[in-house]
Amino acid sequence: MTRLAAAFVAIAGVLASPAGAQTYPNKPIRLVVGFTPGGSNDVSARLLASKLSPLLGRSVVVDNRPGAGGHVGANLVAKATPDGYTLFFTTAGVICVNPHFKPDMPFHPINDFEFVAFMSDYASVMATHPKLAVTDLRGFVAAAKAAPGKYNAATAGLGATQHIAFIVMNHLLDLKMELINYPGTAQATAAIVKGEVAVGIAAVSTMKSFIDAGSLVPLAVLRDKRSAVLPAVPTIVEAGFPEFLKNGSWGGRQFVLAPRGTPREIVAKLNGAIQQAMQDPDMKLKLRDLGQEDISGAAPEKVREIVKREYDTWGEVIRRYDIKAQQ
């Protein structure tokens, strides 16, 4: 293609994008989730999709594409046509954490996406099986130290936030826990409930029903303030391990991405629709029940800035502890 022809194509794209945004959407939108059904990300994505559909006038359909710590779904979206009809619902763990373990990934976690909008942030809780006969984090740490290599921990995959959390915990507290990686949070949590593994971390909403039923014992919320969903569970600071919070954000900031090159007008339209969806009274109630906090107010440029900063911070943590994906 000559330079002149390329220039005409570029100009045509710029001129066409406002018209495309005016008619967008005119067919169903696919919202890809990089984990299996039933986990906290899937639940949140389906809730958002149910509110976006009437606002946009088209169906928003969740498409679960689990694998590689969320990167199967991420790669699918990164390579999709940038027309606003394939979006990625994800968390900081997928974009900011595990890319540091995979320098040969077929996509770049920051440069290959348009950052559409934040949705919410949620707290995570660490829990164990009742058969361990411990009731708090201090008790679990003491038991793990007394029997090096005996206790294992469930994660949602190599490079997932839980994976990093337990590696950091092993380093900070001189533990020898083996990490068992599962395809997603739902499978990891099920393994803890069955007693196949000793301990795990998941969103408070994922753990709550099992904790209420006595199937799991909560050890600590991984924040500096208690969760409204599990108000009786102490924070990790109250449990006596404040240094843990200096090494990363262990919750689950959730956001929506689009393929790089998606027209700005479409990104802006989606951002506005997501912010509007988050103001729905039913949405607010369900988010509260899920232990999530609305953080949707940021413009796309601000979303990119915050996520890039968190990406850099996680890189520093991973280098500091010389963390390897195979650990």
Where are these regions (language model features)?
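Bacterial N-terminal signal peptides
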Residues: 3-16
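N-terminal (or domain-start) structured segment
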Residues: 21-111, 150-152, 158, 174-201, ...
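Short, flexible turn/loop "capping" segments at secondary-structure junctions
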Residues: 23-26, 117-121, 145, 246-251, ...
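An extracytoplasmic/periplasmic, membrane-proximal ligand-sensing/linker region
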Residues: 26-28, 171, 175, 264-327
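Hinge/capping helix and adjacent helix->loop/strand transition within the periplasmic-binding protein
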Residues: 79-85, 100-187, 199, 236-238, ...
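A ligand-binding cleft/hinge motif common to bilobed small-molecule-binding domains
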Residues: 93-104, 167-172, 199-235, 315
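C-terminal lobe and pocket-closing loops
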Residues: 135, 207-279, 309-312, 326
